[in-house]
A protein has these predicted regions:
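Detector for outer-membrane/organellar transmembrane beta-barrel domains
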Residues: 206-314
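Gram-negative outer-membrane beta-barrel proteins
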Residues: 40-48, 92-98, 129-133, 200-204, ...
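Outer membrane beta-barrel
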Residues: 28-42, 58-199, 207-209, 216-223
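Transmembrane beta-barrel strands of outer-membrane/channel proteins
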Residues: 36-42, 88-90, 125, 194-198, ...
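Cleavable N-terminal export/targeting peptides
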Residues: 1-29
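Repeated loop/turn-to-beta-strand initiation elements of outer-membrane beta-barrel proteins
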Residues: 82, 118-122, 189-194, 221-226, ...
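Outer-membrane beta-barrel "beta-signal"
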Residues: 319-321, 347-360
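Outer-membrane beta-barrel architecture
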Residues: 71-73, 111-113, 182-184, 214-216, ...
Length: 360
């Protein structure tokens, strides 16, 4: 009887340990995810990197539809409704296999934090509150990010101001910031967010820093978001901007509208102001086909310079093979105003692309 009892306890103990191990796995998770996007593109009046040109270009480009990237995200249940969360994400140029950033391993995200019913607090490198408005309301749904005026200008990914504003790690854009603390709270249909990025400059804590706040609403087929942020460069010059947007489902069609404005001190006596208007939507043409249309208007005002800007129209036709794989064709046209593109380049530009994007 003793022998039999001992023999039963061994498998029972093994099953108990296995159950505990499974419970531990159920309380934490790590997910590998990513997007692979590559396409063939022809541009007239545009370089392969989408800048103004006097010539035409042909290229295989990465991220025409959706930016190619891979990343890790995870969470651990700490009990009492509290979770630890993290996100590491790196951009990749699929046409060459090179990292999107020459200086950062995880250029798109590198943060860790806590999440509960009151919201989440994360620390590290992450998107600004202006960028969050674009991801929620942009007419293209953040497609063609390197060519999208909402991403590049309204949300400062490519602000062309010639200085690093906020701890972005770059003088060309401030879509994401280093050394930041971010709070996001969701309460029923409403959300709020606040973010501060430390400049970490000796002798002056405000130089190279950034602060921002935002709010949003989402219910049924309606989404609205508004954010304000301010940045400083290493010399203490300021950049202040706001961005708002809204989208609505009308039947099976989606309409979206955005407007953003920012003003930057480029010297002690000079300023640059950019205003960006976006309008567009998504029209299903069948169970597997979507037509996405967007038009953007950019106006730039600079001290002691002629006002300039451009109008840009973009169209995507997408065919969904599955939830994770789709093919796309893209067409765009840009009309520059008052030499925005550079005096030696064409006054208008156009492009056509075709490619495949797969998410995992």
């Amino acid at each position: 009887m003793k022998t039999h009892s001992t023999g039963c306890r061994a498998p029972l103990l093994g099953l108990s340990l296995l159950a505990l191990a499974c419970a531990g796995h159920a309380q934490s998770s790590v997910t590998l995810y990513g997007v692979a996007d590559a396409g063939v593109r022809h541009g007239s009046g545009l370089t392969a990197a989408y800048g103004g040109s006097a010539d035409s270009s042909n290229a295989v480009n990465s991220g025409i539809n959706t930016t190619s990237r891979f990343g890790f995200r995870g969470s651990e249940d700490l009990g009492g409704g509290l979770k630890a969360i993290f996100n590491l994400e790196s951009g990749v140029n699929l046409d060459t296999g090179a990292s999107a950033s020459a200086t950062k391993l995880f250029d798109r995200a590198a943060n860790v934090g806590l999440q509960a019913s009151w919201g989440s607090v994360t620390l590290g490198r992450q998107t600004t509150v202006l960028a969050d408005v674009v991801s929620a309301t942009d007419p293209l749904g953040s497609r063609f990010a390197s060519f999208n005026p909402n991403v590049g200008i309204a949300a400062l990914s490519a602000h062309r101001l010639g200085a690093e504003f906020g701890p972005a790690g770059s003088t060309t854009g401030a879509y994401r910031l280093d050394n930041s603390v971010k709070y996001v709270g969701r309460f029923s249909d409403f959300s709020v967010r606040a973010m501060h990025a430390f400049g970490e400059q000796a002798g002056n804590s405000s130089n190279l820093s950034s602060s921002g706040v935002g709010a949003g609403y989402q219910s049924g087929g309606y989404t609205a978001a508004l954010s304000y942020a301010q940045f400083r460069n290493a010399a203490g010059l300021s950049l202040k901007g706001y961005l708002g947007g809204a989208s609505a489902m009308i039947g099976s069609n989606k309409l979206a509208l955005t407007y953003g404005s920012h003003e930057a001190e480029t010297s002690a006596t000079a300023k640059t102001r950019n205003r960006t208007l976006g309008l567009g939507g998504t029209v299903p043409l069948g169970a597997s086909v979507d037509l996405i249309l967007a038009h953007y208007q950019v106006k730039r005002t600079r001290t002691a310079a002629v006002d300039d800007g451009f109008n840009r129209s973009v169209a995507f036709l997408e065919y969904k093979f599955s939830k994770r794989t789709r093919a796309y064709a893209e067409l765009d046209h840009t009309r520059w105003k008052n030499g925005y593109q550079g005096a030696a380049f064409k006054s208008s530009a156009s492009g056509v692309s075709a490619g495949v994007v797969h998410s995992f």
